[in-house]
Amino acid sequence: MEYTTLAVLAGLPEDPHGAVGLPIYAVAAYGFKTLEEGQERFATGEGYVYARQKDPTAKALEERLKALEGALEAVVLASGQAATFAALLALLRPGDEVVAAKGLFGQTIGLFGQVLSLMGVTVRYVDPEPEAVREALSAKTRAVFVETVANPALLVPDLEALATLAEEAGVALVVDNTFGAAGALCRPLAWGAHVVVESLTKWASGHGSVLGGAVLSRETELWRNYPQFLQPDLKGQIPWEALRARCFPERVRTLGLSLCGMALSPFNAYLLFQGLETVALRVARMSETARFLAERLQGHPKVKALRYPGLPEDPAHRNARKYLASGGPILTLDLGDLERASRFLGAIRLLKAANLGDARTLLVHPWTTTHSRLKEEARLQAGVTPGLVRVSVGLEDPLDLLALFEEALEAV
């Protein structure tokens, strides 16, 4: 089936009352009729026990995401940040190393530097080019971490080449597919990535109303290289032998949900399940508008530089054509310096907010917001300059948006 068909049909459970929509299971715990039934649920993990671990509403969302991303398994969590943390918790142990792309989302860099460091994990930042990654690999490397589209540098890595390299090295390629819009724009697992993490807060939600995140993984024998999957668990089982490729998502569920409690609300799961039904339509419209704006603002005398992967002359265009369904709904304008960016943002009659994927166009100044906690050198390495403005294009009329941008540029 095609993506748009799966988006409305996949994951919808049969309902004893014949409901044609997804019910919200707003309960904390699930009862047992007998001692033996409770014992079996705890022993096997089948069925429902406590909503922190799993619930039917979240399960339906996981099934839909699996279909849309082409995944073996999916685990949904409270936010995209929770998803990234849970995936890395499942992969890493003290003394391990991660090779990460320069130019990641600011909070991901913060997670690496302020949390993973407490676990004794070292992160090496390199350009997300295969040779640079190869040179950074060591015997301690357990993961390579990149974004589908760098936020906000808008560079697109060669996912297939990186996946081949990671497979040869016996380490996991983890891709933050937030900019891939739940598979509507990109499906990294199809290109060989072992793990996908993503924020569902963005395009999956579509209205900036809920938080959510997901970890997805594919069929692979890679987990045989990780000691945590070859040692007995609390049930006395060897995870790899008992679960094969599902040992990784099960560890994500155990660590991220059961033990760390980063559970997704069933209300949020319901809204995200619903949002996925229209994500492909919204992303296609937003991408068309983003290209329209990029083509008309490119070369504007008040714009020092414009980045949009859908433009043929953009540095990311070659990889974008291969990996993305379109140029995407994000573009950036560099207005030259902080003062010019401030005047532009003060004049434009659109929302200024540190979010993406909303039905409304959102603008943000990464230098003073999303990347402000990084040192200046790190910001510049991430492609963030004092004059840069990131634009997440919404569903407004393209001509109206162009008029608003041109009006604001007159104030620069």
UniProtKB/Swiss-Prot annotation:
<comment type="subunit">
    <text>Homotetramer.</text>
</comment>
<dbReference type="GO" id="GO:0030170">
    <property type="term" value="F:pyridoxal phosphate binding"/>
</dbReference>
<dbReference type="GO" id="GO:0071269">
    <property type="term" value="P:L-homocysteine biosynthetic process"/>
</dbReference>
<keyword id="KW-0808">Transferase</keyword>
<protein>
    <recommendedName>
        <fullName>O-acetyl-L-homoserine sulfhydrylase 2</fullName>
        <ecNumber>2.5.1.-</ecNumber>
    </recommendedName>
</protein>
<keyword id="KW-0663">Pyridoxal phosphate</keyword>
<dbReference type="Pfam" id="PF01053">
    <property type="entry name" value="Cys_Met_Meta_PP"/>
</dbReference>
<dbReference type="InterPro" id="IPR015424">
    <property type="entry name" value="PyrdxlP-dep_Trfase"/>
</dbReference>
<dbReference type="InterPro" id="IPR015421">
    <property type="entry name" value="PyrdxlP-dep_Trfase_major"/>
</dbReference>
<dbReference type="GO" id="GO:0006535">
    <property type="term" value="P:cysteine biosynthetic process from serine"/>
</dbReference>
<dbReference type="InterPro" id="IPR006235">
    <property type="entry name" value="OAc-hSer/O-AcSer_sulfhydrylase"/>
</dbReference>
<keyword id="KW-0486">Methionine biosynthesis</keyword>
<comment type="function">
    <text>Catalyzes the conversion of O-acetyl-L-homoserine (OAH) into homocysteine in the methionine biosynthesis pathway. Has weak activity with O-acetyl-L-serine, O-phospho-L-serine, L-serine, O-succinyl-L-homoserine and L-homoserine. Shows a very low CTT gamma-synthase activity.</text>
</comment>
<dbReference type="GO" id="GO:0051009">
    <property type="term" value="F:O-acetylhomoserine sulfhydrylase activity"/>
</dbReference>
<dbReference type="InterPro" id="IPR015422">
    <property type="entry name" value="PyrdxlP-dep_Trfase_small"/>
</dbReference>
<comment type="similarity">
    <text>Belongs to the trans-sulfuration enzymes family.</text>
</comment>
<dbReference type="GO" id="GO:0019346">
    <property type="term" value="P:transsulfuration"/>
</dbReference>
<keyword id="KW-0028">Amino-acid biosynthesis</keyword>
<dbReference type="InterPro" id="IPR000277">
    <property type="entry name" value="Cys/Met-Metab_PyrdxlP-dep_enz"/>
</dbReference>
<feature type="modified residue" description="N6-(pyridoxal phosphate)lysine">
    <location>
        <position position="202"/>
    </location>
</feature>
<dbReference type="GO" id="GO:0005737">
    <property type="term" value="C:cytoplasm"/>
</dbReference>
<dbReference type="GO" id="GO:0004124">
    <property type="term" value="F:cysteine synthase activity"/>
</dbReference>
